[in-house]
Amino acid sequence: MRHGHGLRKLNRTSSHRLAMLQNMMNSLIEHEAIKTTLPKAKELRRVIEPMITLAKEDSVANRRLAFNRLRDRDSVTKLFNDLGPRFKTRPGGYTRILKMGFRVGDNAPMAYVELVDRAETPEVSSTEA
């Protein structure tokens, strides 16, 4: 019986799934908000939250563990220098999933995944001359 094995396979092979989640983690760390399908967003949340928790304590061992998962030096640097200190006092729940309707082509449920304490970019108001 498969009790307690709630891994979403996302209709991919294990290597494809791991590579996809690795790319999505790197994109989320770089941009702090991404748009994806809802099942991918829920699976991304399961892998990115432990990475941010790992980054709260900066050590060589933790950086090596993060690099083993991310395989991107810039992402590891931003994770430990920016995101780790930012979420130091937060005991979890670093991401937010916002449902945003359905995709036009195949009606797949779409969602935004964003970091909770993301610095909001100010709206640029256009003035008519």
Swiss-Prot record:
SUPFAM superfamilies: Prokaryotic ribosomal protein L17
Entry's Gene Ontology BP terms: translation
Keywords: Ribonucleoprotein, Ribosomal protein
Molecular function terms from GO: structural constituent of ribosome
PROSITE patterns according to UniProt: RIBOSOMAL_L17 (PS01167)
Keyword Nucleus attributed: no
A Pfam family hit: Ribosomal_L17
Family designation: Belongs to the bacterial ribosomal protein bL17 family.
Subunit structure and binding partners: Part of the 50S ribosomal subunit. Contacts protein L32.
Protein name: Large ribosomal subunit protein bL17
Species of the source: Acidovorax ebreus (strain TPSY) (Diaphorobacter sp. (strain TPSY))
Organism classification: Bacteria, Pseudomonadati, Pseudomonadota, Betaproteobacteria, Burkholderiales
